[in-house]
Amino acid sequence: MAKTKQRTQVGKHTIELTNLEKVLWPDDGFVKAELIQYYLTIAPTILAHIKGRPLSFVRFPDGIDGESFFQKNRPRYCPDWIDHEKLGDEAAEGKRIDYLLAADEASMVWFANHACIELHHIHARRPHFDKPDYVVFDLDPPEGYPFPDVVALSFELKEYLEGHGYHCFVKTTGRKGVHVVVPLEPRYGFDEVFDMAKTLAQPFVRSRKTTTTLEIRKDKRPDKVLIDVYRNRPSQTIVAPYSVRGS
């Protein structure tokens, strides 16, 4: 079967869309055209959260039942009008990552057309790439842990953090976990923000020893929810609000 192609105008940019009838979710019958339509529709909302942030993608070129891969670097075939930024050690050019950034509806459509189902972003945005503008507490439960209990725990953590004067938001990850996010002014480096997160989390975990832990190794926390503060390290990402998930 010949591959279908279609040109469309999104804002100032002409984008060639391909394989619009490719089934990405076999069990539900959702095709790539519907993924593109979703990201175009949600663009004004999601861009408020991710515009100016370096992005990583989980791509599913053959649908969610096929192989997937995590992409950080800007591909060679990316059009010049897609915003991008090189980050990393300037003394080690080979180790720097050329991240893509979402700037408008057209970039969202281009990402979706390349089966970028999941969007993940770092914790800083232009121009303060070295200074996070939020701290995240990632609640990661073990397999089979009741999701309502994770939600309840996240609101306990929110209340605890608010007791320390922070304004917090709770968001789902689209899978089994929950994020508690605390907005920050971009004034502090990643190390300072990580230390802050760990310092705040330690008393919370000590008061809930039977249900929570800061232990990162899964074999040492079989029945406990990890309060993952290590997500606040440089180059770590979290899934974007309103991102589709592959599973």
Name each model feature, range by range.
Residues 100-173, 184-192:
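Signature for HUH/AEP ssDNA processing cores
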Residues 16, 56, 136-138, 169, ...:
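Structured core elements
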Residues 20-22, 60-62, 140-142, 171-176, ...:
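An acidic- and aromatic-residue-enriched active-site/binding cleft used to recognize and process polar
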Residues 5, 12, 114-116, 134-136, ...:
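Broad gene-expression machinery/nucleic-acid interaction feature
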Residues 2-130:
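Active-site loop/lid in soluble adenylation, ligation, and acyl-transfer enzymes
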Residues 28, 76-92, 146-163, 182-212, ...:
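Helical (often loop-to-helix) elements that flank the catalytic cores of nucleotide-handling enzymes
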Residues 63-66, 179-187, 218-234:
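Short, conserved secondary-structure transition motifs
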